[in-house]
Amino acid sequence: MTEYLLLLIGTVLVNNFVLVKFLGLCPFMGVSSKLASAIGMSMATTFVLTLASVLSFLTNEFLLQPFSLEYLRTMSFILVIAVVVQFTEMLVQKTSASLHRALGIYLPLITTNCAVLGVALLNINEDHNFIESAIYGFGAAVGFSMVLILFSAMRERLAAADVPLPFRGGAIAMITAGLMSLAFMGFAGLIK
């Protein structure tokens, strides 16, 4: 039980996919200008990342390995992710049309979010079992969501601040992301 908790904390804080592994930067920069969109994207990505992580593990364990098809791993994981994202998009469209409009193109782009594929591949490379895969996927999603929401809140405050002209827009956003990454480096000694 302790190792599962350490895996979760390690994935959320110590090895954050956005700030440490630099995965998922496209939605991190693209959706973070408004807090409401960031929260919606966080919920959708959490659902997709967790479900895709589990389904990718099952695909690898019961389809690819028994038939020696490991060379199709990346392509099959992309297919699994695309199906999960399509299901999520239909679910969001039915439950919240306003959120679907707010997320716009970024919802289908979860398919190409390198963090989702990265989690699926790292689960296999790190030889996680089913429970560890689910925890790793959920932890990566929580870490992504936490960083996205924090960054979005900071960007909203920066939009109202008196930022010098050369630093407005993307420049101050990159500086802020770098400072967040430095802050998360403080968690490096948390788990050994």
Swiss-Prot record:
GO terms for biological process: electron transport chain. Belongs to the NqrDE/RnfAE family. PANTHER family: INTEGRAL MEMBRANE PROTEIN OF SOXR-REDUCING COMPLEX, ION-TRANSLOCATING OXIDOREDUCTASE COMPLEX SUBUNIT A. Part of a membrane-bound complex that couples electron transfer with translocation of ions across the membrane. GO terms for cellular component: plasma membrane. NCBIfam families: PRK05151.1, rnfA. Keywords: Cell inner membrane, Cell membrane, Electron transport, Membrane, Translocase, Transmembrane, Transmembrane helix, Transport. InterPro entries: Ion_transpt_RnfA/RsxA, NqrDE/RnfAE, NqrDE/RnfAE_oxidrdctase. Its main location: membrane. It is a multi-pass membrane protein. This is Ion-translocating oxidoreductase complex subunit A. Its EC number is 7.-.-.-. It comes from Shewanella denitrificans (strain OS217 / ATCC BAA-1090 / DSM 15013). It is found in: Cell inner membrane. It is an enzyme of class 7 (translocase).
